[in-house]
């Protein structure tokens, strides 16, 4: 896949301060006599995937960059690359440096269904309210992700490069009225008012010996999250907790045995199991709960059995 015809009009890019990373391409002692444009593509792990040789700076520059076998983007796992652009002159002096997120995604309509990377997806949509400032739009997208919405519906005049960037980074499908009618705009619009109190992608059923994990997501393995379990007393005080990682591919279910010990004190306890983020993401911190369930357990019966033996 190629990134083609990127303009040197830096107005479309968001400026980011990246310390001690200037001068990507000055590989000889001679300085650049005239301003040049340098560019590279980095993956999410910070590994360089491609670069161009310095190009003389012009009002408009076309170039092609290639990423071999790119990791594909979807709303459940919004993997983004970074296009880094820099203007250099003199002895590695940087006039300007900008970055733009890139995503590779195969979006097709197959039999009336929207397929992303070869899999049919369900849109859980909400509409972008009128008159929101940039900071308010980001907060709106954050709440969307936390309430299990994956699709933003917009009017044509609301589309912008900044909104597209945010949707890529947050993991949100963007549908435009009229233009994306075949892609599912109407179906998403009709389904817009449905509220999801629980995450429709993951369902947990907890019993005393473990948890049944039903993975209804399209792309993501449950191993992308930590399985956190804890025991709390009747006052809500935490008696014990631990975490483990479990393998439950998308579209499957699995019962997971969870090793734990009942508290020594007799009584009823809450046994709570959650799937939590393994790392910070743009819309929530590490440890944020994306799905949870609980049951009550008691050690009274077990203690009576032991006393009668």
Where are each of the predicted segments found?
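Secreted/periplasmic carbohydrate-active enzymes, especially glycoside hydrolases
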Residues: 1-176, 180-309
């Amino acid at each position: 896949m190629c990134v083609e015809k990127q303009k040197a009009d830096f107005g479309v890019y968001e400026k980011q301060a990246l310390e001690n990373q200037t001068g990507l391409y000055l590989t000889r002692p001679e300085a650049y006599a005239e301003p040049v444009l340098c560019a590279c593509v980095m993956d999410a792990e910070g590994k360089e995937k491609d670069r161009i040789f310095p190009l003389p700076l012009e009002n408009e520059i076309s170039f092609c960059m290639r990423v071999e076998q790119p990791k594909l983007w979807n709303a459940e796992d919004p993997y983004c690359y970074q296009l880094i652009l820099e203007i250099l002159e003199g002895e590695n002096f940087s006039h300007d440096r900008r970055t733009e997120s890139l995503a590779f995604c195969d979006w097709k309509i197959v039999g009336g269904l929207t397929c992303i990377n070869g899999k049919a997806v369900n849109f859980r949509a909400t509409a972008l309210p009128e008159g929101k400032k940039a900071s308010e739009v980001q907060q709106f997208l954050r709440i969307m992700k936390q309430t299990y919405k994956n699709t933003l519906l917009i009017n044509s005049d609301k589309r912008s490069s900044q909104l597209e960037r945010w949707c890529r980074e947050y993991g949100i499908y963007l549908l435009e009225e009229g233009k994306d009618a075949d892609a599912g705009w109407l179906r998403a619009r009709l389904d817009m008012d449905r509220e999801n109190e629980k995450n429709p992608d993951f369902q947990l059923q907890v019993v005393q010996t473990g948890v049944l994990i039903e993975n209804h997501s399209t792309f993501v393995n449950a191993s992308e999250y930590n399985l956190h379990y804890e025991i709390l007393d009747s006052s809500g005080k935490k008696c014990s907790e631990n975490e483990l990682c479990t393998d439950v591919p998308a579209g499957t279910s699995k019962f997971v045995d969870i090793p734990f010990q009942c508290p020594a004190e007799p009584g009823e306890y809450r046994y709570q199991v959650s799937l939590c983020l393994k790392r910070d993401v743009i819309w929530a911190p590490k440890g944020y709960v994306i799905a949870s369930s609980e049951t009550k357990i008691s050690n009274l019966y077990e203690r009576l059995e032991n006393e009668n033996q």
